[in-house]
């Protein structure tokens, strides 16, 4: 004769405490949560819509640490942006010669790839970077056009949440030759109308400099709605008009789409046991999120 059970078996997984269900959901891939689990019942839908779940998933997948103290406007959007987080520029460190770059101007002896530190140069701050692009005695410019939708950033995300777009570039001169470096970054609409731009004045470095690598960084925030493309262009020329490759050296360029870190009214985190759904109904991103899968 079987021993009597001390507690009756659960008739349904929904009888589990909501905290336990939330913990289970942190182990489920986001694709299944949105396309399958969220459709099972209203309880699952409301739990999956909780900011608390997506914060836990961020912690579990290493997007944040336990001591994270920065405010986040929307943990769901934060999660998906971190999932997509990468450098949108291809071949930024010249490892594949000129692959992926559009040559806009190829003056003098043209663009060339060299290995660090190069003649009369210095080591790059990051030892993982091994090569750089170098310009000549007439203008050399190269560019890439990034298609944000093709890279997985859906239109509703770009227009409603407008995540930060962080642009970085590194440049240096040879110690024995002066040069001029320039950078232009433009945010453009679907029909290539420029909506925002960053184009600082050209930087001129004098001859007999210390050849130090310099980082340029700029963040596009609260830009106009409608951004679909990013144009990145950089280059320059030497100032001595010497044959060969004595112009500015560039490498380790990057464009990264990052979550905003400012809390707003959409950032409330309802806890298990509270009423769900109301705080997220106004701007639920799920209809558009599934497009990334």
Swiss-Prot record:
GO biological process: DNA damage checkpoint signaling; DNA repair; ERAD pathway; glycoprotein catabolic process; protein ubiquitination; proteolysis; response to unfolded protein; SCF-dependent proteasomal ubiquitin-dependent protein catabolic process
Organism superkingdom: Eukaryota
Record key words, sorted: Cytoplasm, DNA damage, DNA repair, Phosphoprotein, Ubl conjugation pathway, Unfolded protein response
UniProt feature, compositional bias: Polar residues: 261-271
CDD domains on file: F-box_FBXO6-like (cd22168)
A Pfam family reported for this protein in Swiss-Prot or TrEMBL: F-box-like
Gene Ontology CC annotation, any one: SCF ubiquitin ligase complex
Ranges of residues in domain F-box: 10-57
Keyword Membrane: no
SUPFAM superfamilies documented for this protein: F-box domain, Galactose-binding domain-like
Modified residues (Phosphoserine): 258, 284
Ranges of residues in domain FBA: 78-259
Chief location bin: cytoplasm
This protein's pathway: Protein modification; protein ubiquitination
Compartments (UniProt record): Cytoplasm
MF terms (GO), sorted A to Z: carbohydrate binding; ubiquitin protein ligase activity
UniProt cross-references to PROSITE patterns, sorted A to Z: FBA, FBOX
PANTHER family with a match to the protein in the record: F-BOX ONLY PROTEIN 6 (PTHR12125:SF12), F-BOX ONLY PROTEIN 6-LIKE PROTEIN (PTHR12125)
Described purpose of this protein according to its UniProt entry: Substrate-recognition component of some SCF (SKP1-CUL1-F-box protein)-type E3 ubiquitin ligase complexes. Involved in endoplasmic reticulum-associated degradation pathway (ERAD) for misfolded lumenal proteins by recognizing and binding sugar chains on unfolded glycoproteins that are retrotranslocated into the cytosol and promoting their ubiquitination and subsequent degradation. Able to recognize and bind denatured glycoproteins, which are modified with not only high-mannose but also complex-type oligosaccharides. Also recognizes sulfated glycans.
Protein name per the record: F-box only protein 6
């Amino acid at each position: 004769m079987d021993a009597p059970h001390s507690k009756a078996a659960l008739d349904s997984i929904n009888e589990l405490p909501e905290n336990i269900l939330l913990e289970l959901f942190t182990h489920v891939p986001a694709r299944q949560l949105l396309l399958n689990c969220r459709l099972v019942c209203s309880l699952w839908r409301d739990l999956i819509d909780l900011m608390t779940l997506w914060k836990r998933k961020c912690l579990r997948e290493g997007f944040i640490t336990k001591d994270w103290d920065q405010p986040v406007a929307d943990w769901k959007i934060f999660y998906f942006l971190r999932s997509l987080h990468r450098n949108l520029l291809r071949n930024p460190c010249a490892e594949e010669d000129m692959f992926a770059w559009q040559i806009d101007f190829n003056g003098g002896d043209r663009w060339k790839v060299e290995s660090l530190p190069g003649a009369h140069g210095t080591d790059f701050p990051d030892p993982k970077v091994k090569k750089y692009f170098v310009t000549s005695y007439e203008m050399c410019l190269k560019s890439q056009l990034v298609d944000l939708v093709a890279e997985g950033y859906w239109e509703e995300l770009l227009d409603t949440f407008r995540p930060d777009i962080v642009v970085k570039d590194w440049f240096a001169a040879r110690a024995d030759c002066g040069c001029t470096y320039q950078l232009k970054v433009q945010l453009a609409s679907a029909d290539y109308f420029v909506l925002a731009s960053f184009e600082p004045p050209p930087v001129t470095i004098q001859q007999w400099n210390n050849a130090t690598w310099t980082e340029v960084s700029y963040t596009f925030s609260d830009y106009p709605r409608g951004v679909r493309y990013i144009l990145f262009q950089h280059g320059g020329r030497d100032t001595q008009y010497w044959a060969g490759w004595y112009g500015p050296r560039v490498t380790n360029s990057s464009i990264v789409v990052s979550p905003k870190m400012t809390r707003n009214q959409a950032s409330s985190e309802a806890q298990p046991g509270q009423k769900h759904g109301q705080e997220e109904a106004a701007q639920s991103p799920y209809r558009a999120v599934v497009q990334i899968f």
